[in-house]
């Protein structure tokens, strides 16, 4: 806790990646859409996020595609919709910026023009490679279709994310374990979803190291963006640090002072403003 009380920190996948990230600033910055929020997928029973992933033996694939009925059986995340709405409000974005429930599909995400969107946020389940039987790479869970196809089987994988066209200042992943590896035996941390979003064109990403509490994740993401909305000069890492301190010092819920609540998230990439 002493580190976050004194410093705001940012992580880079590699030192060389910093020059690439800064080179990706484009003229699109002057004509940006402020926000796109994707999440609250239509899934099964409601349950706390940290209890949401089925056991590793669950069979989630039929051939190369996911079993959409199995994806649909994943627990729903009722707080993710309100969380994304709060993020939109913090950036002055309207309801049209939100792609929730039935609109939060893999096909819709691939069809969206996100190339001029400043902040893109996903609020859903994050899956590690191998976490479900047959899952060869990390993925984000979206609303599954009636029938799986190569373009949409309910799982937006790291390789599919890398093919998106982004020029976002920030991608926020309000999901579990999004700082994980790409699944190779010798893979390093951040080589999965984080690297995929950087490759797609994000300058910075908010990722998590372990399963996150729904309530804490929502407060951290909305608190971070609210601080940036109030002070355009504040950096992303500093805004996250202040949101973490707010949780740690909450006298109404002392469980939030435990690092398991406030510490999973970190900024990867460009931590400034």
Sequence positions of predicted segments:
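Catalytic cores of enzymes
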Residues: 1-273
């Amino acid at each position: 806790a002493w580190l976050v009380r004194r410093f705001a920190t940012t992580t880079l996948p590699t030192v060389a990646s910093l020059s690439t990230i800064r080179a990706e600033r484009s003229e699109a910055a002057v004509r940006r859409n402020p926000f796109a929020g994707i999440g609250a997928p239509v899934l099964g029973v409601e349950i706390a996020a940290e209890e949401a992933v089925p056991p590793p033996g669950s069979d989630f694939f039929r051939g190369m595609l996911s079993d959409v009925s199995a994806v649909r059986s994943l627990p729903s995340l009722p707080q993710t919709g309100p969380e994304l709405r709060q993020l939109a409000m913090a950036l002055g974005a309207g309801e049209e910026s939100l792609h929730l429930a039935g609109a939060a599909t893999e096909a819709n995400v691939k069809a969206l023009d996100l190339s001029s969107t400043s902040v893109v946020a996903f609020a859903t389940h994050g899956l590690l490679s191998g976490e479900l039987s047959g899952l060869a790479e990390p993925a984000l869970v979206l609303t599954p279709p009636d029938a799986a196809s190569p373009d949409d089987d309910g799982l937006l994988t790291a390789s599919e994310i890398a093919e998106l066209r982004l020029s976002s200042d920030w991608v926020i992943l309000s999901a579990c374990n999004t700082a994980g590896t790409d699944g190779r035996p010798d893979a390093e941390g951040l080589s999965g979803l984080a690297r995929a979003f950087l490759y797609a064109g994000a300058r910075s990403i908010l990722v998590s190291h372990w399963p996150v509490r729904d309530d804490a994740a929502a407060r951290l993401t909305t608190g971070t963006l609210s601080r940036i909305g109030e002070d355009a000069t504040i950096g992303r890492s500093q805004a996250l640090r202040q949101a973490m301190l707010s949780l740690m010092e909450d006298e109404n819920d002392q469980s939030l002072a435990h690092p398991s609540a406030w510490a999973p998230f970190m900024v990867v990439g460009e931590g400034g403003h």
